[in-house]
Amino acid sequence: MSLQRRPFLALALTAGLAGLFNSTAAFADSALDGVMARKSITIAIPTDFPPYGFVGTDMAPQGLDVDMARLIAAKLGVAIELVPVTSANRIPYLQTHKADLVISTLGKNPEREKVIDFTAAYSPFFQAVFAPKTTALKTPADLAGKTVGVTRGAIEDMELTKIAPASADVKRFEDNNATVSAFVSGQVQVIATGASVAGNMMARNPQLGVEFKLLLKDSPNFIGVAKGDDKLRSKVNEIIAAARASGEIDKLCLKWLGRPAGDLPN
């Protein structure tokens, strides 16, 4: 090969590689374009974690996360494909492009931020005090003289200990099942537990008329987006912001959690 031809080959190779990288970048940013082109979005949701996601008596998925997924699809004007995931495979579903979004009680932490991106928060995930609607309970002071069931060593146990008055009779149980059983059977008047446990308990025991009473600790949920997909993330953030402003997200949280969304981080 002549020396004169080598610079031209080098330039051609450089241009080719640049085109490849630009194509890859365009592909990485095209998730929203793909959704709009096919008029359908694939969203991963939980089906084993009430009240955020579970299978109803009609065998259809329902819950806060499911309703949020449907809200996003409706705002985009596209059909929706719901894909059930577990805690273990929800992030890999984003990484392998099996889902455009993951709406599955995702908390944000540094390790997850290395591999996926997050939208603004869309709902709270919390530990709280629950009791029948007929129980007068508006402040921690109202726990005085009441029996309160809690799972030993759980986050709600630690948070309850911080606020419970000395006269509250706190009864600790070894696991969530025992705590719930004690409350349902009337051994305790009040229960301190996580939103998911409470949601499942309320769904199974509607006759108790249980409702949210006091917040112990709040940990918001975020929607997962593939790493670097800023276009889709920005669009979903627009939808979340509008839904928060209109009260739609508060309505979803009241429906499934018994409380409004409250202050959520952007």
Predicted regions and their residues:
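Extracytoplasmic small-molecule ligand-binding "clamshell" domains
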Residues: 29-105, 246
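Acidic, polar ligand-binding/catalytic clefts
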Residues: 70, 74, 79-142, 209-210, ...
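Ligand-binding clefts/hinges and TM-proximal coupling segments of bilobed small-molecule sensing domains
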Residues: 29-30, 155-172, 210-212, 241-266
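Periplasmic-binding protein-like
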Residues: 123-131, 199-241, 259-266
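Ligand-binding cleft/hinge of the Venus flytrap
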Residues: 55-57, 69-78, 156-172, 202-206, ...
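Extended ligand-binding regions for polar small-molecule ligands
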Residues: 66-75, 141, 146-147, 152-155, ...
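A ligand-binding cleft/hinge motif common to bilobed small-molecule-binding domains
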Residues: 89-92, 106-114, 159-162, 184, ...
